Amino acid sequence: MRILLWPIHGGYTDAFVRGGHEYVLAVRSVRPGEDDGVSGWGWERARAVPLDALRAEHIDVVVLQRPEEIALVEQLTGRVPGRDIPALYLEHNTPGGPAVATRHPLADRRDIPIVHVTHFNRLSWDNGVAPTAVVEHGVPDPGQRYSGELERVGVVVNEPARRWRTTGTDLLPEFAREAPVDVFGIDAGKLQGVFGGRAAIEPVESLPPDRLHSELARRRVYLHPFRWTSLGLSLLEAMHLGMPVVALATTEAVRAVAAGTGVVSTDVDELRLAVRAFLHEPDWAREVGARGREHALAHYGLATFLARWDDILTETVAAWPLSRTATHTYANAGGKTTTTTVAHAR
C-alpha cells in the first residue's frame, strides 16, 4: 500500500515506516540544503513529499493524527478522507479533559476508524459511534546495553518544565532524595534552577537516539513518573535496554510493566524505596531489567507492532465501500510476507 501521513511524532513514525509499504510523508516545502525533518532519519521505504505536490500522488490510505488533517487532505489532494479515500485516525493521546466526559473529535463519524495506541486510551475516550481498534506500541530493539554503572536515576521526558504535573516533573525531588536524577529530553535544560538547587536533578542536553540509549543504560534505574500521558516510548525503550524500571501505576504503565519486570505503584514513597533497593542491590537490578527486556521484546517488539498495523490497514481498505481491488505482496521489517487486497478509488 501507499500510505499518506504527517511525520509529527518522530519516534512513532520511525517504527511505523519500517513496515513493507510505501510511506508518503507530508512535509512543508524547504529550500535546498534545509532540513525537511524526514530525510535525516534514513528511512528506506518513506519519502518526503512537499504539501503542494501531494495532489499528484497516488494514495491508498491516509493515516490521520490531528483533526485538522481531514480538511488538509481534502485541500491538498482533492479527496475527502473516509469518502473519496480510505482513512483512519491514529490517536496518540489520553483525553485532555475529564476522561469520563471527553468526547473524541471523530466520535460522530462511522467512516473513519479511530486507532488508539493503548487499551487505556480507548477505554478513557468517549469514542461515540466511531469504530475503534488498538495497536499497541512497538519499538526498534536498541539491544541489551544496560550496565547500571552509575548510581543515578534516569528519566526521559520532553518539555518537563512546561508539562510539569502531567509528566510528574514535580515528583522528581522525592526521588532525588535517594540519588541524583538525570533528566533527558527536549527542553530538559529548562529545568536548570527550577528546583532552586534543593534537589540533585541534572538536566541533560537533548541527544540523538543511539547516544541517548547508551547514556541512559549507564544509569542504575529508569524512572517513569508520568501522571497522565499515553504509554511513553521511552519506558519501553528503557525496558528493551535491560534497565529495571520504577513507574507510577497510571494510564497504561500497569499493563506494560508486568509483575517481576519492575515496580509499579501509586505510592510515591513505595517507588522511592524501590529506587533505593535497586541502587543498593545491583545484581537484583540487573535480574529485574533482564526480565523486563524479555517482556518488552515479547509484547512491544517491532514485528508484532507492524503485523498488527498490516491487519488494521488491510481491514480498513477492504471495508471501504467505494473501491475496486488489486493484489499486492509486501514484507515488513519483522520478516512477515503478506499478500493483501488493496482498494483504489473509482
Where are these regions (language model features)?
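Extended catalytic core of nucleotide-activated donor transferases of GT-like folds
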Residues: H9-Y12, V24-D111, F120-L123
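Donor nucleotide-sugar binding/catalytic pocket of nucleotide-sugar-dependent glycosyltransferases
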Residues: T94, R110-N158
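Conserved catalytic-core segment of nucleotide-activated headgroup transferases in glycan assembly
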Residues: S124, P140-A199, P203-P209
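Short alpha-helical segment that forms part of, or immediately flanks, the ligand-binding pocket
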Residues: H213, L236-H240, T251-R255
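Aromatic "clamp/platform" in nucleotide-sugar-dependent glycosyltransferases that forms part
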Residues: R227
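Short hydrophobic beta-strand element within catalytic cores of glycosyltransferases
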Residues: P244-A247, V264
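Conserved acidic donor-binding segment of nucleotide-sugar-dependent glycosyltransferases
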Residues: A259-D269, A277-P282
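A charged, aromatic-enriched C-terminal amphipathic alpha-helix characteristic of glycosyltransferases
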Residues: H280-T314, A318-P321, R346
